Amino acid sequence: MKASKQFRHQRRIVDGVLLLDKPRGLTSNAALQTARRLLNAAKAGHTGTLDPMATGLLPLTLGEATKFSQMLLDADKAYEATVRLGIETDTGDAEGAAIATAPVHVTDDSIRQALAALTGEIEQVPPMYSALKRDGKPLYEYARAGIEVERAARPVTIHSLELLGVEGDSLRIRVDCSKGTYVRTLAIDLGRLLGCGGHLTELRRTRIGPFNVDEAVTLTALEALPAESRVGLLAPVDALVGHLPRIELDAFQAGLLLQGRVLAAPCGAAGLVRIYGEGRYLGLGECDGNGTLSPKRLVSTVATAQQS
């Protein structure tokens, strides 16, 4: 009986990237585990948490792709958001309790001036309701206990902040930003600049690095596919590193690299590169700028978007 149970839960090796359109009300981890179950994947991770209230692009890394998740964690991101003016909440979003209210008297000009003030290199104080840790404990645990701890402001870059529309006391905005940006904090800061307070009521992530939500699949659509067809939705592992220079090695060089050897190679400027051997993605290497290539992060299987 025990052997039969183990057999039923046996996972398969799946390598690739699933671009998931996360629904509202689901945690990122719950979405990950559902997708992992539908793909019967042995190993999976995600590349940047979305709050339960948020929807949109959540790239999931499977198998060998988990080794390169940091590439997306460090990437720029884009969002569309709705900010409700006149009410500030303790969480910065609609799930929190109101802590301040004020009448809303804004104009198109005042809105655009406030958006301009929040564009460029700015500093943000991370919200208490966040997963950042203090003394090994997430800030949201302190917040739930009614404890507020001091947080240092952190530099972030808002590449663009665009007004999409105004409906009553709500603003629709589009944000293009660096990693580490809290759109909830932007909503709070925007409300304060407008003199009336504000909080986030809707958030949708539309882009991470090279990936767009238009390319993503919902859990409902994934589940509707025949089990054997689902893996066909995966992007290959090297889609995570497509922005890096490409180095091609012959079979002999590739063999040495996979043994951890440093090679002489025409790899140009210093920095990370993606390495291929006879067309196969081998992983990441680092060039020193003087013709020397060192292995940094290599795949341990043939890294494709298909099951091995």
Swiss-Prot record:
The protein's Enzyme Commission number: 5.4.99.25
Coiled coil: none
Enzyme class: isomerase
GO biological process: mRNA pseudouridine synthesis; tRNA pseudouridine synthesis
Stored InterPro entries: PsdUridine_synth_cat_dom_sf (IPR020103), PsdUridine_synth_N (IPR002501), PUA-like_sf (IPR015947), PUA_sf (IPR036974), tRNA_psdUridine_synth_TruB (IPR014780), tRNA_sdUridine_synth_fam1_C (IPR015240), TruB_C (IPR032819)
SUPFAM superfamilies documented for this protein: Pseudouridine synthase, PUA domain-like
Reaction catalysis annotation: uridine(55) in tRNA = pseudouridine(55) in tRNA
UniProt keyword annotations, A-Z: Isomerase, tRNA processing
Keyword Translocase annotated: no
Active site: D51
Gene Ontology MF terms: RNA binding; tRNA pseudouridine(55) synthase activity
Entry's transmembrane regions: none
Keyword Iron: no
NCBIfam families, per database record: TruB
Annotated HAMAP family: TruB_bact
Family in the record: Belongs to the pseudouridine synthase TruB family. Type 1 subfamily.
Protein function: Responsible for synthesis of pseudouridine from uracil-55 in the psi GC loop of transfer RNAs.
Name the record gives this protein: tRNA pseudouridine synthase B
